[in-house]
């Protein structure tokens, strides 16, 4: 019984610490200086609460590229049990107008996600590179490695690789989406969000 009480106290303390950290982040992230916002994001590394993930993910829309990169790097260290960062990370990864390093940081963060369907689709879109976009080949090769490890598949790194991934995704999309929906429902139930 003492062990249970000690564990409960530890859990409550950790939640309280993250809430304080999140409150400080919310205040500090309003600073006009990008360096201060980067610093605020850095303090959120390792966050696990959904409210924290949602707050940090907003940094992906910051006008300063260094803040976006810091946000993606931070999200890579977080436990996003509710999948709250998936959509904003995918949006940047698939946007060819965004900086390649930022897009790669988003791919790395997505590779840590528990939710596979949307993240896999975004990575496949990111590696689908037109012949006129030769400057993206190295980026595409890096994302292909990340995608392979994330999905547990290897289709090499050739011109045919995106088509192979697209075919694989068509065959597995429903299964991935179903697994994601089940994970989300279980998370909502455990977090008291699904009634």
Question: For each of these PLM feature ranges, what is it?
Answer:
Residues 16-27, 49-61, 80-94, 116-130, ...:
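Amphipathic alpha-helical scaffolding segments comprising HEAT/armadillo-like alpha-solenoid repeats
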Residues 158-195:
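Pro/Ala/Gly-rich low-complexity, hydrophilic intrinsically disordered segments
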Residues 45, 76, 111-112, 148:
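Structural signature of alpha-helical solenoid repeat scaffolds
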């Amino acid at each position: 019984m003492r062990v249970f009480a000690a564990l409960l106290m530890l859990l409550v303390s950790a939640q309280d610490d993250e809430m304080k950290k999140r409150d400080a982040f919310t205040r500090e992230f309003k600073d006009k200086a990008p360096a201060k916002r980067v610093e605020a994001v850095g303090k959120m590394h390792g966050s696990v609460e959904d409210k924290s993930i949602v707050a940090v993910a907003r940094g992906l829309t910051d006008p300063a590229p260094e803040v976006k990169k810091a946000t993606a790097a931070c999200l890579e260290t977080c436990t996003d049990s509710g999948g709250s960062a998936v959509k904003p990370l995918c949006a940047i990864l698939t946007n060819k107008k965004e900086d390649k390093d930022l897009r790669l940081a988003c791919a790395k963060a997505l590779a840590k996600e528990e939710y596979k369907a949307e993240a896999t689709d975004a990575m496949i879109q990111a590696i689908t590179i037109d012949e006129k976009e030769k400057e993206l080949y190295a980026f595409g090769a890096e994302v292909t490695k990340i995608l392979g490890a994330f999905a547990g598949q290897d289709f090499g790194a050739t011109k045919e690789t995106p088509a192979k991934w697209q075919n694989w995704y068509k065959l597995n999309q429903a299964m991935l989406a179903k697994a994601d929906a089940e994970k989300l429902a279980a998370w909502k139930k455990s977090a008291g969000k699904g009634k």
